[in-house]
Amino acid sequence: MLRYVYFNGFGMRQGLLKRCSSHILRRSYSSDIRNIGILAHIDAGKTTTTERMLFYAGKTRSLGEVHRGNTVTDYLTQERERGITICSSAVTFPWNGKRINLLDTPGHIDFTMEVEQSLHAVDGVIVVLDATAGVEAQTMTVWSQADKHRLPRLVFVNKMDRPDADFNKCVEDLKSKLETFPVCIQYPAKSNEGQLGIYDVITLEQLNWQQKDLGRSYSKLKLEPSDGLRQLQDKRNELIDQLSGLDDELADVVISTESFDKVSNELVNKALRRVICQQKAVPVLLGSAYKNIGIQCLMDAVNHYLPAPEERNEIYNCFGNELAGKVFKIVHDKQRGPLTLVRVMRGELKRGMRLTCSSGQAEVISKLYEPLADEYREVSVVSSGDVALCAGLKSTVTGDLLTSSQSSLKNAEKRFKQQRHSDGMSEEEDDDEDHHLDGLFDLAPQIPDAVYFCSIEPPSISSQTAMEQALRQLQREDPSLRVSYDSITGQTVLGGMGELHMDIIKSRILSEYKIDVDLGPLQIAYKETIEAPSLTTLSVEKEIAGTKQNVSITLELVKNQSEIFSLDKSPENLQNLNKLRPRIVQVLRKGSISALERGPRVGGQVVDTQIRLHNAIIGRGTADAFIMATAAQCVQKLLSENGTRLLEPIMALQIVAPSERVSSIMADLSRRRAIINDVLPKGDRNKLILINAPLAELPGYASTLRTISSGTASMTMQPCGFSNMNSSDESLAIRRAQGLE
């Protein structure tokens, strides 16, 4: 139910959530906790910003630097070697009376799943922008993920010390590309020497950082009229005007006062907090993490403006004082084994406590830790609203809801249902809720489709078991890693989100498990679709263990992008279908759909196809497994006899290159079946090229681009759908999939 009401915004109206949570037994807990995530495009400065936060909060004694490989949050060997974040990491630190639990997330598109998991555990986010680039491709991706979870957010415009930084462009990008309402509470103040300071719009002060003590201290200078005070006052008036249009309480104050100057800073801050928590506006701050400027103000903004745990997740109030914990990540520690990261929604987690996970398995917490990336401090209890690492949980998986017992979960469901009825819910709402009752608190992550596949082989037969164990652990940690067994080739097959993702998996198996596995050539994850509708009847009769098994089924495949399975409601078939028990229909549905997982051309998933059941005659005593297998055979027969067409994945590329290199880059792209959508100016010397190109034409393209541009161009790439192929490209793809090219 949570997936539909709260996180994804589907299902029942928000009003229902408010009605229920206002009556159900409430749990009070500390409002001094802030659970936040930090999101950005790759290389915008997320990890550097996080490292500065830890340093100024007193958690670290030296500044961690990405280029030196000594950061706290990027602790994997691969992260330090490559200078990128691969796995989300949790850190806890105090700041001005508040306790901040921060999750640093990856910026590369291959690790979007890490971001998705982390957002289940936070109450607000910081979105970091590169001041020289504005809103970039992955910024838009993570922003839409935050929208899905309805998370309040702050924007931090980083790298403002750079000569080519453009604060105004970043603000315009927020409006045009993200369709949000930015309110600037800071503006850049650059000295004649180029030293970056910050104008505080609310207090009308100029803030200047001291570099002698690594930015630990900064001065506040009250502006005089000669220092541009009038211009800053105009900005403050503009801010108040914007907020009063969004907040009724502030609007009433503005109407009753003579001028904006009479509106106190306290009233402005309170109004700002309300509109942020209601997601009516996004405050914009600025600084330079690398130059140690603006980080303290950013942490103050987290404390002042982002919501406390009790202001979110009201739906969990049905648990009262009982435990409700949300599993959002699992990591493997060499000494401690699997460690489960849990956001405690209600109740308390205690060392030695018995738990029940979503599968119904009983678990016992052997030890509890406070997170600090890959270092942990043992604690005995973790309260509501906080984040903990649990050791000893063996059956729990990402997305589970942890409760103190099955009866506790049932009582919470009962309490919630009672409240729904006492609130006078309509029949339509009631039916919708009952439909999802089995998954009332299901938080299983939505795993994106794999982009690449490849085989994986151990160095020797004796290493096979160890490799399979390593893959199980990595898959538990990273749900976007797909592991399957190909019965035709007898190989283990990996599915991943990109070349980098697969490369990292191989590297981690070597460095963490000491197994030098061999990866086969990367195969594109093509999909297949039918060319025309087709209809067939399959009758199968066998005797198994002395029992006669008899199934006759008529199925049709038609083009459809919405519903994957349906019943033919025509008069000649309706009478027969109405006689089928719902359980038999579900068995037929499950068997039919399973056959779409592997198409006849290259084994790709069959999409944009609907299975329509026309008729089914099931003999008495026929086993469900036999019915399911017959349905799958019928679909496979239709696909094999009538054929499918390939659909190839298309990637959206954004390339930034010097103007003089654009023609050579575009000439190379034209040979790769690319479609150039636009070429836009990017600063004074660069161009931004927007391209759609088939993934099959882009293996190793990052290296090619570096060669063509002599290392001056950069690119980002993300999936943007699938497209039909012409016959020659399709034939080439099939030969490549068969290893003939």
Swiss-Prot record:
Signal peptide interval: none
Biased composition (Basic and acidic residues): 411-424
Lineage: Eukaryota, Metazoa, Ecdysozoa, Arthropoda, Hexapoda
Keywords in alphabetical order: GTP-binding, Mitochondrion, Nucleotide-binding, Protein biosynthesis, Transit peptide
Function comment: Mitochondrial GTPase that mediates the disassembly of ribosomes from messenger RNA at the termination of mitochondrial protein biosynthesis. Not involved in the GTP-dependent ribosomal translocation step during translation elongation.
Protein name listed in UniProt: Ribosome-releasing factor 2, mitochondrial
Principal place of residence: mitochondrion
SMART domains for the chain: EFG_C
A cellular-component GO term for this protein: mitochondrion
Annotated source species: Drosophila willistoni
Location relative to the cell: Mitochondrion
Binding site for GTP: 40-47, 104-108, 158-161
Family designation: Belongs to the TRAFAC class translation factor GTPase superfamily. Classic translation factor GTPase family. EF-G/EF-2 subfamily.
Pfam families: EF-G_D2, EFG_C, EFG_III, GTP_EFTU
GO biological process annotation, one example: ribosome disassembly
Region (Disordered), start-end ranges: 408-436
One example GO MF annotation: GTP binding
Domain of life: Eukaryota
